[in-house]
């Protein structure tokens, strides 16, 4: 008994073992107590992906293209002319490339540029990385505004920095609701009537900087919003250019949301007078009267608060997992993990015939998984790929612990302390090289925006790092303390 207490004392006073214990405690607190989440069952605060709780994913493509061009004119003149000819927003990307925020085929653009005395050099359907970041932020704001939980939004950007797709994963959301939330993109624009039924684009939704709550004026519901300084200046210039300031009745201001008209009326005399003197930032979009008008105002507010997407999108792919199937997959994953640990325990015992090796090995492996989950809860949803990563961490972890055990043992006994430490350092060297290889192999998968194996790579890398830095050294000290009571060879 005294010998066992002495062994435990050696183990629990070693600083490397204490670090692992502290990390395990912090991880458990993170999963179940910060914030309190005991009512959520075994998953606690872990972020479960749609594979495990049910939900939907939607992949969107962009009705836009990034082109490279050659032209003798300045870029500002080129953009102005191209924007007028296409009636679309044209945004500079580099000194020789632009983003066109409407869909045109390569042949159509070659013809248009030829008419301008320019040449089309490259053509890529998609948007610039900067616009992609804007779209991602807008979608995140939109789904957060709607109260949707557990959302993952990732973009797929190629080596040429052109983003072709954005993928939205909404856990706990059915496919119809997901499509309504995501594909209803709130593309807002203001146009002005030039003559007859002809209109010209004035500005798009990214000029909207703030939005008020729905309010009633003269029994009509509407949403007030504020334009940026550039947007207000563009509105004033257009109203003066097309005569809306001097003849407002002939030049309605038209507001469109997703191509549908939500407001059309001439400038008020008060607004016309203000515009003649300077830019006006505060405007209002009327949505009608009664309950329908109020509901439309609420929808408009949501889209404007989230920010209107600068480009049109279309659904390129979608799928869903039912909540029942998600629960079934959770059960299968838990069962697989338990069976895996039991199988590992059996094989380790069969190899060493020594319970004092099996128990520490399994406990160290479990502590590694707990620490990994405690960290992953902040940075990674647990989907099937992530679960596969956890199982891989269990397997590679046991492999490395076996390497340590085989290296330090001599005929089942611990050698002298100096020889033990020498062999232990050699084992850690082997493990570190192996871990480095794994990390470098997984990095490309972890850095790919839309890779379905991204979760697998992230979990595997984290698990390997936790093992090499914390749990492997602790295991070495535990084994040394437990088996040191055996006679040295």
Swiss-Prot record:
Q: Which Pfam families match?
A: SecD_SecF_C (PF02355)
How does the protein's chain sit in the membrane according to the entry? Multi-pass membrane protein
Family matches, as Gene3D superfamilies = 3.30.1360.200, 3.30.70.3400, Multidrug efflux transporter AcrB transmembrane domain
What is one term from the GO cellular component aspect held by the record? Answer: plasma membrane
Q: What is its main location?
A: membrane
**Membrane-crossing segments per the record:** 17-37, 328-348, 356-376, 384-404, 428-448, 450-470
Question: Which UniProt keywords are given for this protein, alphabetically ordered?
Answer: Cell membrane, Membrane, Protein transport, Translocation, Transmembrane, Transmembrane helix, Transport
User: Which InterPro entries does this chain map to?
Assistant: SecD/SecF_arch_bac, SecD_arc, SecD_SecF_C
Keyword field contains rRNA-binding: no
What are its GO biological-process terms? intracellular protein transmembrane transport; protein targeting
| Entry-linked NCBIfam families | PRK08343.1-3 (NF006217)
Q: How does it assemble?
A: Part of the protein translocation apparatus. Forms a complex with SecF.
- Known function: Involved in protein export.
The UniProt entry's sequence similarity note says: Belongs to the SecD/SecF family. SecD subfamily.
The name on file for this protein is Protein-export membrane protein SecD
> What is the scientific name of the source organism?
Methanolacinia petrolearia (strain DSM 11571 / OCM 486 / SEBR 4847) (Methanoplanus petrolearius)
Q: What is this organism's lineage?
A: Archaea, Methanobacteriati, Methanobacteriota, Stenosarchaea group, Methanomicrobia
Q: Which gene encodes it?
A: secD
